[in-house]
Amino acid sequence: MKRSLGVLVFVTLIFGAATWRENVTRAAAMRGPQAQATAQTPPTIASVLDRDISNVEKEVVDAAEAMPEEKFNFSPEGLNIPGSDFKGVRTFAVQVKHIAASNYFIWSPITGDKLPDGLKDGNGPENLKTKAEIIRFLKDSFALGHKAAATLTAENILQNPGKSKSTRIHLATFGVAHAFDHYGQMVEYLRMNGIVPPASRAQSE
């Protein structure tokens, strides 16, 4: 499943770059030779991946900031919904820390960075309790993602960094896919508390 997600995101990256180039070329041609020369700055693997990291980063960070601090430890288990089985599921805070922790675990092999102090598992450091601390941890993890994306080239994307068993492109794209996966769970937690996710507010107004 993880490999399939990585392949899907990789194909999307390549298709997106090709579509972008076609659209830019067509638009520049309509504006004349000078505009065409200025507009044709081709995307790179690094720039396309960096854009996708920015996209998921905005969705996740905005969702995290939308949840009031007093609701950060909310879990669907506490709703006691008849017929449901939410026993032991992560709280909203741990969902956010899980995304950040996974970002570090997935992207640090690409950059060679050491893991932050206290990061031992997928639930993130136990000492991070407040909303501000958790969101800072989240933002820092995406900064590592941008750093990882900047290292990608056509020559190294199929190499395995360090002792990793995965290629650079698989790690880079899987980080994006994983974050989007858990963003979907964050959305459900927000809606269970009567909060419309920021990304959906324009659509609902």
Report residues per predicted region:
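Positively charged n-region of N-terminal signal peptides that target proteins for export
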Residues: 1-4
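Bacterial N-terminal signal peptides
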Residues: 8-17
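Signal peptide processing junction and immediate N-terminal pro/mature segment
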Residues: 19-34
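Acidic/histidine-rich alpha-helical segments that form the ligand environment
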Residues: 125-160, 170-182
